[in-house]
C-alpha cells in the first residue's frame, strides 16, 4: 500500500459554557482542549503515512491542505454539527474521500449517508484496523461499526500523536485513564459510546503518556477526560495514583490535573487524599438536581439518599474544587425548581456551576421513552445551555425557558458569582503546597484582569473587594481567585448572550 496522506480535521465548537471563548484571550490561548480522539487515531495510522491535523478551533482550513490529502478524516461531537456540515461542503468541492468517526457519527451516522464516503464508527481501536485492512485489499465498505458490546482493551492503546498540534494554542492537554461508566442515567449517551463496564489503562501506560507530554515541554493543566475517573477505585488507589505521585515528585510536579467523578468520591477520604497528592485540584460532578424526585426519575441513584451539600463540602474541604453539572427540565420539575436550583448552587459554594436544559440524545433510554410518548420534537443541538430543548416538556415550554434564563442570569450575576466564590474559599482547604510559577502568560492574564474586570466591566466592585480580601486573608489562593474571576466573566457573557435568544 502506497504512502497515503491523511488530513485530520476537527470542526469548530460554537460559543458554549465550556468553550471559554471570553476567558481564553486573557491567557493568549485559542482553545481549551486539543482533539484527543483524532490525535489517537493519527497514532493508530501506519507510521509511514503522511499526516496533518487542522483544529478549526485554533486555525483556518486552507485549500493547500485539502489538495495535499488523499483522505480527509473528520471526528466530531454533537455540538460541532454545524461546523461539520460546513467542513464537508468545503472538502467535497475538492473531490476528496471523507472518512468520519467519533461520537456524532457513531450515534447519528444516518444523517450523513449522502455526504460521507466511509464511516468508521465506535472506538477506533476496534474499527480503524478493519478500515485499513479493507483499504489494503481494495475492499472498502461504506460503514464499519463494532459488534454489539465489542469494546477494545484500552491498555493496548497507543500514545496520542501530540507532535501534530501546536501545544501553545491550548489551555490544557488531555489524557484518558478509563472508558465506560457503571451507572445508567436515563439521559446519558456514554454507555452507548463506551459501555457500562469501565475499562482501564495500566499505570505503565499512564506514565508513558505523561512522559510524552513532559518531553514535549508541556507544563500546566492536564485534563483526565474520563466520564467517571473513579469507576475503578481499587486500581486507582493501589496502582495508578501512587505511580503518578512518585512520577510527580521526580519531575517536580509539572502538571495540575482535573477530571470528572461521581459524588460518591465524598465517601472515600483515602482516594481524595491520593488524588490531591497526585496533583488533582478540580473535579467535575454531575449533581443534576436538588430535587430528589427528579434524580429518581432520571435514574441518578448515586446522588440520592445523601446530603448533597454536605458531600460537596467534604470534597472541597479535602482540597478538591467541585465544578457542578445541573439540569432543568425533568418531568418531575415544577416551577419551584428555578428558585430551588439557585439557592442550592449559592449555598454549595460551587463556583463553576453549569446549568443546562435537559436534552434527549438519540438512542438513549430517555430518547426511546420520549419517542414512545410521542414527545420528541427534533435532534439535540449538542449544547444544553443554548436555551433549546428537543422534546415537549411536562412544564409549560415558555415557563421552562424563561425560568431557565432567570436561573442562569441569577447565578452568574457579579453579585452572586463573587458571593459563591467567597463561600468556596471559606470551605476549600488545599492539602498540598505546590510551588506556583509566575509565568509571563499568567502575569499578562493578571494585568488583563485588572483592566477588563477591575475597570471596564460591571463586576469591578466585586472584583476589587475579593482582590484585597484575598491578598490579606488568602494570599496563597490569590492566583486561583484571579483565574476564577476570569472564568466568571466568561460565564456571565455567555449567559447574557443566551438570555437574548428568542424562543417560540
Kindly give the residue locations of the regions a language model identified:
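Acidic, low-complexity intrinsically disordered segments
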Residues: 2-218
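Conserved beta-strand positions
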Residues: 8, 74, 121, 224-226, ...
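Radical SAM enzyme core and accessory elements
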Residues: 2-8, 50, 65, 135, ...
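Radical SAM [4Fe-4S] cluster-binding motif and immediate context
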Residues: 156-323, 328-330, 334-343
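Flexible glycine/acidic-rich beta-alpha junction loops that bind and position SAM and/or redox cofactors
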Residues: 13-19, 108-110, 183, 232-234, ...
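A C-terminal junction/extension of Radical SAM enzymes
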Residues: 54-58, 147-151, 155-157, 321, ...
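Structural recognition of alpha->loop->beta junctions
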Residues: 111-130, 274-282, 342-355
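Amphipathic alpha-helical segments that form well-ordered structural scaffolds
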Residues: 40-44, 243, 406
Amino acid at each position: 500500500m502506497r504512502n497515503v496522506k491523511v488530513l485530520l480535521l476537527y470542526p469548530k465548537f460554537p460559543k458554549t459554557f465550556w468553550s471559554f471563548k471570553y476567558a481564553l484571550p486573557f491567557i493568549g490561548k485559542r482553545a481549551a482542549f486539543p482533539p484527543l480522539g483524532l490525535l489517537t487515531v493519527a497514532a493508530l495510522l501506519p507510521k509511514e503515512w503522511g499526516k496533518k491535523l487542522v483544529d478549526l478551533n485554533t486555525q483556518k482550513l486552507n485549500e493547500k491542505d485539502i489538495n495535499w490529502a488523499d483522505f480527509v478524516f473528520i471526528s466530531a461531537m454533537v455540538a460541532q454539527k454545524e461546523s461539520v456540515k460546513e467542513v464537508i461542503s468545503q472538502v467535497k468541492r475538492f473531490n476528496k474521500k471523507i472518512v468520519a468517526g467519533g461520537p456524532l457519527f457513531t450515534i447519528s451516522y444516518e444523517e450523513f449517508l449522502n455526504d460521507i464516503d466511509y464511516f468508521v464508527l465506535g472506538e477506533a481501536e476496534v474499527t480503524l484496523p478493519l478500515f485499513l485492512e479493507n483499504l489494503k485489499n481494495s475492499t472498502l465498505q461504506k460503514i464499519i461499526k463494532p459488534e454489539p458490546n465489542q469494546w477494545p482493551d484500552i491498555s493496548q492503546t497507543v500514545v496520542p500523536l501530540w507532535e501534530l498540534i501546536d501545544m501553545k494554542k491550548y489551555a490544557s492537554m488531555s489524557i484518558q485513564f478509563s472508558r465506560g461508566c457503571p451507572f445508567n442515567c436515563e439521559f446519558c449517551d456514554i454507555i452507548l459510546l463506551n459501555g457500562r463496564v469501565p475499562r482501564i489503562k495500566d499505570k505503565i501506560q499512564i506514565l508513558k503518556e505523561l512522559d510524552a507530554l513532559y518531553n514535549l515541554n508541556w507544563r500546566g493543566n492536564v485534563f483526565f477526560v474520563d466520564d467517571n475517573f473513579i469507576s475503578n477505585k481499587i486500581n486507582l488507589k493501589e496502582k495508578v495514583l501512587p505511580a503518578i505521585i512518585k512520577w510527580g515528585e521526580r519531575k517536580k510536579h509539572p502538571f495540575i490535573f482535573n477530571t470528572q467523578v461521581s459524588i460518591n468520591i465524598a465517601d472515600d477520604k483515602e482516594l481524595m487524599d491520593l488524588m490531591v497528592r497526585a496533583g488533582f485540584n478540580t473535579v467535575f460532578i454531575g449533581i443534576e438536581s436538588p430535587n430528589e424526585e427528579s434524580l429518581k426519575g432520571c435514574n441518578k441513584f448515586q446522588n440520592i439518599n445523601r446530603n448533597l451539600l454536605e458531600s460537596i463540602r467534604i470534597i472541597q474541604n479535602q482540597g478538591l474544587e467541585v465544578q457542578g453539572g445541573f439540569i432543568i427540565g425533568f418531568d418531575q420539575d415544577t416551577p419551584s425548581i428555578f428558585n430551588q436550583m439557585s439557592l442550592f448552587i449559592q449555598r454549595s459554594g460551587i463556583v463553576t456551576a453549569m446549568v443546562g436544559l435537559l436534552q434527549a440524545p438519540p438512542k438513549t433510554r430517555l430518547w426511546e421513552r420520549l419517542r414512545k410518548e410521542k414527545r420528541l420534537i427534533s435532534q439535540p443541538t449538542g449544547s444544553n445551555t443554548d436555551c433549546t430543548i428537543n422534546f415537549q416538556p411536562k412544564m409549560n415550554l415558555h415557563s421552562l425557558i424563561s425560568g431557565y434564563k432567570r436561573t442562569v442570569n441569577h447565578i452568574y450575576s457579579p453579585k452572586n458569582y463573587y458571593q459563591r466564590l467567597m463561600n468556596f474559599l471559606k470551605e476549600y482547604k488545599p492539602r498540598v503546597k505546590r510551588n506556583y510559577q509566575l509565568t509571563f502568560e499568567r502575569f499578562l492574564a493578571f494585568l488583563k484582569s485588572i483592566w477588563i474586570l477591575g475597570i471596564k466591566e460591571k463586576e469591578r466592585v466585586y472584583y476589587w473587594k475579593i482582590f484585597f480580601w484575598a491578598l490579606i486573608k488568602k494570599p496563597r489562593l490569590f492566583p486561583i481567585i484571579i483565574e476564577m474571576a476570569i472564568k466568571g466573566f466568561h460565564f456571565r457573557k455567555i449567559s447574557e448572550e443566551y438570555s437574548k435568544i428568542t424562543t417560540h
